[in-house]
Regions:
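Hydrophobic N-terminal alpha-helices or hydrophobic patches in metabolic proteins across all domains
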Residues: 94, 232-234
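Short, solvent-exposed aromatic-acidic interface loops
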Residues: 76-82, 149-154, 208-213
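Zymogen propeptides
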Residues: 21-144
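Domain-core and long-helix interface of multi-subunit machines
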Residues: 171-232
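Bacterial Sec-dependent N-terminal signal peptides
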Residues: 1-26
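A substrate-binding/cap region within the structured catalytic cores of diverse enzymes
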Residues: 129-182
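Residues that act as N-cap/strand-start positions at coil-to-secondary-structure junctions
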Residues: 57, 129, 163, 189-191
Length: 235
């Protein structure tokens, strides 16, 4: 029986300032002193601190998963439940925040369909414009897909899980068009998390911390796109 890795449904973002990625940022990521911990067979956790990455201090964590050893799933949990607590309760060996939610009501504001049942739909507004990608999981295997309101209306999948989020940054190694996304959300620094498929068929859970002035100030979407490309991302 394979162990389980879950994508937790909820994520909260907070704003900071924007800056462009540079060659120096690429070199900083490549030359970083990553603290590497082996959690289990096929699961490595890497963590690094940067005095200046994309113009500000950063704290970056990367979980590298060899998918043949693990099944992935989406866990729906209460907004006030800590990620680590929800992961432990579900029996997962690792977890990452996976999409956006309404802080008052607690429900997802992005489309979520699990085994033919629509749990939530994508809300209108800024988050609706950036929710142009989806995680599709079936029998523990994961794909990343482009998504739109048209796909959402037409979706009739009876098996597996679809969780919409975004913006989708890379497909087949090429940057995606994010011109239709809310530009304030795209260009403002936030704490961010990303799911990445690499060229060597690994899965990365990338977390960039924020909300900590002078220690970890977050990234915007172009910066996050640059980061996952340097880390070997394909999708």
């Amino acid at each position: 029986m394979k162990n389980k890795v879950v994508l937790l449904l909820f994520i909260v973002c907070s704003a900071w300032t924007a800056t462009a990625q540079t060659v120096a940022d690429s070199l900083a990521l490549v030359a970083a002193h990553w603290q590497v911990t082996s959690l289990k067979k096929g699961v490595l956790c890497r963590k690094a601190f940067f005095n200046s990455l994309y113009g500000v201090p950063q704290e970056v964590s990367v979980l590298e998963i060899t998918p043949k050893y693990y099944n992935l799933d989406v866990l729906i949990h209460q907004p006030k439940e800590e990620t680590s607590v929800a992961a432990h309760r579900s029996g997962a060996i690792a977890a990452v925040n996976g999409s956006y939610f309404n802080m008052k009501a607690g429900n997802s504001v992005c489309y979520l369909r699990k085994n033919g049942v629509v749990v939530d739909t994508t809300a209108n507004g800024a988050l609706g414009t950036v929710s142009n990608g989806a995680v599709f999981i079936k029998k523990g295997r994961m794909k990343l897909l482009p998504w739109s309101k048209q796909e959402e209306k037409a979706c009739r999948l009876k098996h597996g899980t679809v969780l919409v989020s975004g913006p989708l940054m890379l497909m087949n190694g090429k940057e995606c068009d994010i011109s239709a996304c809310n530009q304030s959300f795209v260009n403002t620094k936030h704490p961010r998390s990303a799911i990445v498929l690499t060229k060597d068929k690994k899965i990365l859970f990338v977390v960039v911390d924020g909300r900590m002035k002078g220690k970890a100030e977050g990234v915007n979407i172009p910066e996050l796109t640059h980061m996952i490309r340097v880390l070997g991302g394909k999708d």
